[in-house]
């Protein structure tokens, strides 16, 4: 959905900006907000289905987007802040996830204008997606990658994706969290160990 919105916008306006009070800008922002609402509902549906399979009950505690644009004032200047793979620091506790073979961290953000009111949204990649299978296929079969060194399980029917998202392709989450803590941007609260990871491209199968 987001890609379709972007494609239509670029086809119409190239990469030029739009006056924020124009009809075109308002139309784009309305589509942007609709995409965020769709993503929110999709996450809720996934969570509900997981709870149903576990025959458990639960309620949402965290729901944080990390690809969106919003009005923001920095150093007294009003403008628009685009987060592309960044977590807002003003919504309370957030999770900074590691790879499927590493811990994730629950952290308390420290609101900071210097960091554009944003935090890292995960460990970050070491390798490009296109090189992961070449690096790993001689060492691991897809079946072997369905178990991690931490004992957690991975459900993924896409043979390309399971290599692209392998733990080896990501940085250590501890190094990222330590950097944020040393910079005074977060207070670590809890360390979370993965139990089950579901990965899907939504269109491919084994």
Show the residue positions of the predicted features.
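Domain-length cofactor-binding catalytic modules of enzymes
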Residues: 1-206
